[in-house]
Amino acid sequence: MATKLAYRGSEPTKFKKTKIKKDDEVLVISGKEKGKKGKVLAVDKRKDRVYIEGVNKRKRFVRPTQENPGGGAIEIEFPIHISNVMFHDAKAENKAKPKKKIKAVRLGFAKKDGKSVRVTRPEGKEV
């Protein structure tokens, strides 16, 4: 008796090492929210998604409860795929020339004193 395997789309990646962490300042580089900056509220490593403060907000309708007796619509942040955001380095943007603004930088890992730390690439400055 052969069992039929169902295709469930892209399987979630477990225990993936992400370069974006909570409380980082990031810039959205693609999608309908392109160009917006915000602070990372949470990282969902299982689904490769990030929640960013003030970005990708949607309305949800809630029933009246004791905490919210009126009920109604509330706006909450929805996740964005981690490939659509880049780390934003405010220090580098302030030092840049006015014509050439540095919006986002790539992150990498480097060994310092036996520990793995996040650094900007290609400069190698520790974050």
UniProtKB/Swiss-Prot annotation:
<keyword id="KW-0689">Ribosomal protein</keyword>
<dbReference type="GO" id="GO:1990904">
    <property type="term" value="C:ribonucleoprotein complex"/>
</dbReference>
<comment type="function">
    <text>One of the proteins that surrounds the polypeptide exit tunnel on the outside of the subunit.</text>
</comment>
<keyword id="KW-0694">RNA-binding</keyword>
<comment type="similarity">
    <text>Belongs to the universal ribosomal protein uL24 family.</text>
</comment>
<dbReference type="InterPro" id="IPR014722">
    <property type="entry name" value="Rib_uL2_dom2"/>
</dbReference>
<protein>
    <recommendedName>
        <fullName>Large ribosomal subunit protein uL24</fullName>
    </recommendedName>
</protein>
<dbReference type="InterPro" id="IPR005825">
    <property type="entry name" value="Ribosomal_uL24_CS"/>
</dbReference>
<dbReference type="GO" id="GO:0005840">
    <property type="term" value="C:ribosome"/>
</dbReference>
<dbReference type="InterPro" id="IPR005824">
    <property type="entry name" value="KOW"/>
</dbReference>
<dbReference type="InterPro" id="IPR041988">
    <property type="entry name" value="Ribosomal_uL24_KOW"/>
</dbReference>
<dbReference type="GO" id="GO:0019843">
    <property type="term" value="F:rRNA binding"/>
</dbReference>
<keyword id="KW-0687">Ribonucleoprotein</keyword>
<dbReference type="GO" id="GO:0006412">
    <property type="term" value="P:translation"/>
</dbReference>
<comment type="subunit">
    <text>Part of the 50S ribosomal subunit.</text>
</comment>
<comment type="function">
    <text>One of two assembly initiator proteins, it binds directly to the 5'-end of the 23S rRNA, where it nucleates assembly of the 50S subunit.</text>
</comment>
<dbReference type="InterPro" id="IPR008991">
    <property type="entry name" value="Translation_prot_SH3-like_sf"/>
</dbReference>
<dbReference type="Pfam" id="PF17136">
    <property type="entry name" value="ribosomal_L24"/>
</dbReference>
<dbReference type="InterPro" id="IPR003256">
    <property type="entry name" value="Ribosomal_uL24"/>
</dbReference>
<keyword id="KW-0699">rRNA-binding</keyword>
<dbReference type="Pfam" id="PF00467">
    <property type="entry name" value="KOW"/>
</dbReference>
<dbReference type="GO" id="GO:0003735">
    <property type="term" value="F:structural constituent of ribosome"/>
</dbReference>
